[in-house]
Amino acid sequence: MVKRRYSILCVMFAILIGFSSIAFSQQTTYAKEKVTKVTYTTKMKNDKECMIVKGLSSKKKTIWSYKTPYRTCAKCSTFKCIVKKNRVYVFDYLRLLILNKNNGKRLYTVKNTPERGHFATVTNKYNCYEIGYIGNNSGRLYKISPKGKILYKSAKISKYSYGWPSSIKVSGKYVYVGCYKFNGQPKPVTIKFNEKNGKFLGEK
């Protein structure tokens, strides 16, 4: 009788190990699926909006997702998303989140960045340059390091009679910002900054 009970327990234990192995295998396979595409959409609710970012597999299966807090709607977008190599940059109101593209893990959080109307670009070395259209910290050029540190923020471009930034580009030793000049009849111009220190250098 004792041997029979022992045999039954051994069989049950073996079955349990088998099921556990299968479950673990499925979980590992799912976790190892490669993210081939990142999507982002905005969602409205009671005059507020949020952004939902997802990492998808080649079969459009959601590997990970991230949802920002709801923010009050404004005439300029509160959010922006840039995918660069194996990173995802989520510009969310007054902060920047840098995520791992493969698993959605947050790598760095940068606070006190431009509020709305984000114009930004990221280089192959993960240096990020950003300028905001409106709101707190707008009109200042920011350079953010690969490790999520603000290296500099320039003086406001309004100090030099410019405003309403509309584009940004990094080329060689300079950062170029498309904007408008305050001169009665605003006209589109391109101004430039020293890439290393953010010093304003006038029009291109």
Describe the role of every protein-language-model region.
Residues D47-I52, L94-L97, N136-Y142, G184-I191:
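Structural motif
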Residues T36-V38, R87, Y126-Y129, Y174-Y176:
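Conserved core beta-strand positions within WD40 beta-propeller blades
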Residues S57-K60, N100-N103, S145-G148, N194-N197:
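Short loop/turn segments that connect beta-strands within beta-propeller blades
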Residues T39-K43, D92, E130-I134, V177-K181:
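Recurrent small/Gly-Pro-centered beta-turn motifs in extracellular repeat architectures
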Residues C10-S21:
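Bacterial N-terminal signal peptides
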